[in-house]
Amino acid sequence: MDVSNTMLLVAVVAAYWLWFQRISRWLKGPRVWPVLGSLPGLIEQRDRMHDWITENLRACGGTYQTCICAVPFLAKKQGLVTVTCDPKNIEHMLKTRFDNYPKGPTWQAVFHDFLGQGIFNSDGDTWLFQRKTAALEFTTRTLRQAMGRWVNRGIKLRFCPILETAQNNYEPVDLQDLILRLTFDNICGLAFGKDTRTCAPGLPENGFASAFDRATEASLQRFILPEFLWRLKKWLGLGLEVSLSRSLGEIDGYLDAVINTRKQELLSQRESGVQRHDDLLSRFMKKKDQSYSETFLRHVALNFILAGRDTSSVALSWFFWLITTHPTVEDKIVREICSVLIETRGTDVSSWTAEPLEFDEVDRLVYLKAALSETLRLYPSVPEDSKHVVNDDILPDGTFVPAGSSVTYSIYAAGRMKSTWGEDCLEFKPERWISPDDGKFVNHDQYRFVAFNAGPRICLGKDLAYLQMKTIAAAVLLRHRLTVAPGHKVEQKMSLTLFMKNGLLVNVHKRDLEVMMKSLVPKERNDVVVLNGKCNGGIGEGVAVNAAVAVAV
């Protein structure tokens, strides 16, 4: 190498080093390395990524900026990532400047093959049209009733018998896998009216369910790889891209058959005047003012399955784990359930487990809803979400975000900040969701509690999710006491969804309801039973009551 080239190389390295020193001082948060940016730290902390992000946010006051590619001209644009958990910043992104923070091209490219332009993967007018159409359906009581039927049938005929078998045989069961199967069956029933039967004795494999899981896994892997690399693998037919292609073929074939059959059924129903189908797919197909393509209908079903399956199953897994480590909370929940059932079904405990809880019974379980909400605060099903910045903007805390960069809001960290939730923010404390004045459930600000998203994109199925979670939780806790299997280690799986890495292996024990009933009904006076620690309230509004309350029997 001649002298001129050597001097040029030294000058380039020196210029880069000066630039790097300047940008390192400008960025705050995790350490930034030359060229690689913050990627080394991200890789090093991959097994505890969400806690690591939370620690950095605490140290930086709720917002920090870093770069994943420390290269001039990229570090402050495409390579720049702003990370925040500040409620004001989250409200700014998800509501105030909603149009400036879409999902963006990266997200859409990753999920396009799987979800197309469905509601979960679209922006702008495409998203708005589907949102308005779906919102009309989610406000109907008939959809809630349909969800209730699928949930209760699955609990009674499959879920509870499997748990009872595990109890009788003294065998541990992976509760996360079992709940995931149950919620998958439920959401498929609600989405397109088909029983996938994945939660059945023997836990059979279902071709559609397996293809759906493989397609989800392959799509999520694309987030880890640079776009040019996964596109190259797709073009060459390598790795999980092969699995994705095959799985999508199976999914499309299954749903096309469902759609074609449903079209014929709906045609016959119109001719006979009998309406039998109330699933989401049928509701879209029955709209007289629209004619949807099979591709659109297929994506409608897939988007709602993806959005609706994991939220409930992941939340319930963490809920049951927390319950095993907080016996006082468990006792309060069981007492609340039993108190409601004494009112609605009497003191014969055999009637309590004969059928799953009905709407009016589930609606009155205030403390249970508080415990589930507290679970979602600490362990949100989707721990991090990201938005693309369309135009230069300044967040409410003064952080400048340039066009072309991305902003990640940490839902996990938002639930663990002392500035938002107090000094006891890391404690599992359902009481923070109950008003000390009247015992009613407290709905915290949606930009502090972001487990169901917020703003125009807030989860349409939030109420259905609570209905499903409360019904399943009540069914389990009413019949069983759970303990984590000896030696089983509960860890977070680093994914877009906060699954447990090793599942949740539990031992199932029988709950003695007679003892609980006697503690709630200690004595009788004439025809009045005195209840201790009951939940009282009208249908649709729960009131947690600690004092003894007399009710006629």
From Swiss-Prot:
Spans through the membrane: 2-20
Task: Please provide one cellular component term from the Gene Ontology annotations of this protein.
Answer: membrane
Which SUPFAM superfamilies does the protein's record reference?
Answer: Cytochrome P450
Tell me the compartments it is located in: Membrane
Q: Which UniProt keywords apply?
A: Heme, Iron, Membrane, Metal-binding, Monooxygenase, Oxidoreductase, Plant defense, Transmembrane, Transmembrane helix
Q: Which reaction does it catalyse?
A: an organic molecule + reduced [NADPH--hemoprotein reductase] + O2 = an alcohol + oxidized [NADPH--hemoprotein reductase] + H2O + H(+)
Q: GO molecular function of the protein, one example?
A: heme binding
- Pfam families reported for this sequence: p450
Q: How does it sit in the membrane?
A: Single-pass membrane protein
User: Which co-factors does it depend on?
Assistant: heme
Q: What is its EC number?
A: 1.14.14.1
Q: In which tissues is it expressed?
A: Expressed in leaves, stems, flowers and siliques. Expressed at low levels in roots. Expressed in guard cells of cotyledons and leaves.
Annotated positions binding heme: 459
Q: What class of enzyme is it?
A: oxidoreductase
Q: Which GO terms describe its biological process?
A: defense response; fatty acid metabolic process
Q: What happens when the gene is disrupted?
A: No visible phenotype under normal growth conditions, but mutant plants have reduced content of cutin, loose cuticle membrane ultrastructure, show increased permeability to water vapor and display enhanced disease severity to a virulent strain of the bacterial pathogen P.syringae.
Recount the UniProt induction comment for this entry.
Answer: By abscisic acid (ABA), auxin, wounding and drought, and in etiolated and dark-adapted seedlings.
- What is the documented function of this protein? Catalyzes the omega-hydroxylation of various fatty acids (FA). Acts on saturated and unsaturated fatty acids with chain lengths from C12 to C18. Plays a major role in the biosynthesis of extracellular lipids. Involved in the biosynthesis of hydroxylated fatty acids required for cutin biosynthesis, cuticle development and repression of bacterial type III gene expression.
Q: Which family does it belong to?
A: Belongs to the cytochrome P450 family.
Stated name of the protein: Cytochrome P450 86A2
Q: Which organism is it from?
A: Arabidopsis thaliana
Query: Which gene underlies this protein?
Result: CYP86A2
